């Protein structure tokens, strides 16, 4: 084994195995995307005058209780439009049974009693740990009601989309910030807009503790024919410093209000987009980016991947190609160490349900937010039988249950496999594995010096196998589990497995 040029300081932090950072050499192994362990429809009461407007939703863990923000529209409307969408709120203690928040601030669709918190708003609420402007709750999204005058003052003088009188281009658009002390009563941030562009999907903003800046993930526009929707990224040092930092392009059409049409790559770099490995007409958007707070250097995104039917002819087998801007969507998984460079793994994370089921089979969008309860992570997504561009059937919200750290694993089959890490420097006296060996699998860990020489007492021959299934299994050798004598010096791990899935490792103090 050649001398290493880099030693990874892992301390006592948990390290996830979703890329090759900790796999310097290997044989007989593969990385695997693991879909949710369980998918359960939620029980969400409905109001007679409203129906789902789109698939966009967000779940927040607020003081141990779950808050679900989702979007509805008046039932009599034929097709969803962001200007007739309403952001609504529900609460739950168990994540399955929900109650509508008794907001009762606006009369909508003839309903005086309802859970609408923001009429004409489409976007993503988030919790700001910095409590900018003294507010814990913030929201990023589009604003603009159809009703005149708007029933909500905060939607006045906003632009979701309009048409320029000179050339007919749709250029009046912006993305806005709002804030709230209680998550129910919202006020618009008046110091500016996030971006003066039309990003009419579920956009995101959150504080990145690693960089000390606020990060926005926005819908971008690709110049590549057939690949229109992308994910763009911008930053700002503060929520009050608007717009987010982007280079101006004076050649872009501009409305009298100083607003533009789509967000192009010269103004905001793409971090996710369709490419040559996708079908020619494929969009990637609504990224649902989640910094993973239970491990080091891990960000998971769950973009919707949309394959367009345009230009197809199914010869009357079905309706493919008969309508513009139509086609199916699935949720894929993208992984990142820094929130900038993403590796989109092409296996569906939440795929389409059976077409024969009345509520499934057309489109799936993941909601924003990860919630941990014990050894499991919970997410929420919306699925419907309708494909994009067809809105004759409603969407339904589901809960997805995932194992802690379980999104990606390094897997060995029954013939076995192994990998060796680069040199790492740890703290603590115990080594823990999040691993599933089932009933027939096992794993062994050998610790080596920086050059790859097995360390006495920690060789493969000394190793006691780890078996069965656990999120924090202690590694032992014949002399016991104590790795404290090696703390603070460069070592390598050689992990040998068969019939096993390894998700993460972590050094810790003795238990």
Residues of each region from the PLM?
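Beta-rich carbohydrate-recognition and catalytic domains
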Residues: 1-203, 207-286, 291-361, 374-376, ...
